[in-house]
């Protein structure tokens, strides 16, 4: 279904906007605006981003795939009793068949003491029963062991718990802790199985864990998950912030010059593993692959010359990536995530270069963790917590607080960091059951439209659900633009019930940057909380030549994920509109004449229950 | 003079603030709000931050000190014909006796062609006439040579110009360029004299220059400024952004466990050089030193154990610092500055560690350059451009655009990056003639005041000049605070003529971070430009123990420079109020009871002509 309206809008001259709320008495009202009366809350709980029905959630934990039941399991830092962080902190649990719809399971396990926290950690499948926790009554594919941090009485230690019922209930190991270094900042173990390059290698478990306020990722090895040997540390690299948290080390396929025919929304259930050093091509045939026929995005990565460091990756077909979250201290404010591309020999991680790379340039992307045991062996799937510690406890939602990011599929690619240089980057592709989501939805398209300042275009959604994807490709005529004129292409994502509330998303041609303004809301939190950065931006390099740009986005009630340049740059940000005010239209506008051509703007509004 | 008012303010309950401007017709007005009608401009030109009277300014260039005349010279990227960047781009010039009051000199030199730019560069004093440009008629202390980039017709090359009249007029070298590598992105040479560690060394000139879009700082040497040899490159380190620009390499004194009796505002005219490997102690006796008796800030750096890497610095008493600006691509948006602490052997720079450090966490601090030939040899004095390329051409000022930062004096210190770890940092101290500025000003003080939510304090300025310094020390009682309550100490810097306009500055106890909100203004640019980040924040670690914090700030009409923890963390940001609306009062308030004690808030309003 195509709906295309063209309305004339009266163009008012530039006016000083008086904010009558900003005098002393209004300032006084700000001082008192921390209450959570329901009128000041946004109840627009996301549909395809996981959130618990009630209570507080932070970091994703223990992500694993059950190959027997074909279920995806996620756990998370969970305080079920109130929508704010509190003790005892437990592990919540949810299960999905398609990484899209999640079935909440409640508390999986918690700490023994009321004033303790079962802090973040990971899960592994102990197929070969190295731990001795299992016997033949547990299918090898379901021999789940959780490795987590007990925070109690000024001490942080690493603990084990195991499950005999496929991850629904857990027993705590009687000889816990398995790691205690007499520290109050030693947390977030992520464990994986390292088989070794040598075919005769027996393999062993490897743990990365943060000595948080020393900015150290400690790397341990173990034969049995119980006895751990410190092998090395990766310390004080990149941007430090105030603390390192939630480290992770993962082998990521290197993809060169690949046409992502199916991107974004890659196939994560193709049969059989892709060979790591082959060129990855995603199948379109899977039930949850991107449906290329509805929103085709045929974007080819550049053929530019590889920089020296990539020759190593070309040969082996993968790199190791060290993920580190830091909090607070981001120059964007609060918490952030960085990563390092390098090599791992079983005991030591060595970065390939000295570049500091941030993963996701938005404000709400923290504590990324990857799944253990993806069915397609080379797929690296991960979830981050879509919030920021600066304001996470105070975001205006009720009775839950915080959601996860979408699942993303990560690859290492090279991209044009500018017109003369390529750089390696961790590429992100969102993973959802797009076929099903689009099936009963509605679609809208704009094509081949040159924008001018005297008119605008409106895509108006039928029965707004607040959940949709969009794909924008545009070209820019840089000739004759003036640096003193704000030269924008703007998309206004406007509330259906209250048009005062909108997201403004756009590009400015002088600065060659993309912007997002999430400040246009009637919710007091948005108006007043000084940590809720309203205006965000990213540099958006062209995807293939110098004048064509693209952005893909998924909007889900109160969160927007943006994927620039086919996923080489991302920005994930929450936003808060009044209860029930779903985005109902997209207004496409430019303040200048004949600078922008919309090559295509395609929108699929998802049908959700 | 002490003024202390305590007013009761009616506390309204939290209310939804309706923004009536946000419907479609108001959106339309945004599209057209790029005009510069005088009613939408802020004419609040700063008083002690340099700006040209008319026209466009960007990077500081060619900073040097004339020891004969005892004058400080600055040059800058200057387009005098309009308040926006344009060609031909020239070098503007200004002179000061005290780094506080600047005497504008107009254009020093420009390119030969109308469509060319005399892009950024530096100046040196060629005491020994290595260049051959001088004879005995020019005092050795005034043998000024400018090294700059000619940008013309898709090429960037390094050029020389020299002055026989102490830096007022220049002659271009007839055999220009002196460096041409067939590049369109080869710019911003910064040259210094390297004497070498060996007493028999003859010394030579060293240039750092950016191969911008290769993320390379090229390091050249020369005996005569004309013939340059490529020695090494410093490439792809730290955060890349989109381009490297304005590199600089400078030897910075290492200061350990020093009480800055005179900080901030350090002495830059003490007689005789301080020995580089002695402990630096700043004199209080100088005419332009910080006057400790009026606003004493006796802050002692911690005695915590040095990390390993500092032992090298302890021994030699200094480190080399590589300054790199990058644009765009900062996660805060647009342009930013980073630096690397390391060693330089005359040909190669090697960082001491792999940490990425940003210099100034605000939005408006770019293209930092240091002075050649400071009278006190160990002083490292520098100036940055106080704007951001995202919006610099569109900020609402007229008929000038952009100002410089204050001069800062830099040292390497260690600081408590968190409660368990120290890190090396480039410490900043603002340099101004504080004695003179305070002399005819007015002073205001608050002391030993526990804040509660039912009242507030007001410091009201007599005859607001818009230019003042403030020093805040506060302690926080973390016991019993709630993570779901925004637990703030807020300072509202309110306009005298229009109280709708204010800066909100404060600290939040749950996140342990400091915030600045510059969004409360009636100026359309502030309301509408999506790149003008309104809300900024920094992590503010305690200065000495776990519950006492400090911030020092200088406000100058439309710019605020914040120095946290005695200068270890800074944030520089412009702001824009309506014409003539100077800050006239500071309202001190907390939304919670008995969490904050103001140990002291001291304010000196400066008298300016």
Curated annotation (Swiss-Prot), chains A, B:
Pfam families, sorted: Glyco_hydro_32C, Glyco_hydro_32N
Any one GO biological process: sucrose catabolic process
Domain of life per record: Eukaryota
Signal sequence range: 1-14
Entry GO CC: extracellular region; fungal-type vacuole
Catalytic residues identified in the record: 59
Keywords: Glycoprotein, Glycosidase, Hydrolase, Signal
Glycosylated residues in this chain: 23, 32, 36, 128-129, 135, 227, 233, 257, 267, 277, 284, 291, 298, 303, 345, 409, 420, 440, 448, 452, 477, 545, 566
GO MF term set: sucrose alpha-glucosidase activity
Enzyme class: hydrolase
Descriptive protein name: Invertase
Lineage: Eukaryota, Fungi, Dikarya, Ascomycota, Saccharomycotina
Gene name for this UniProt entry: INV1
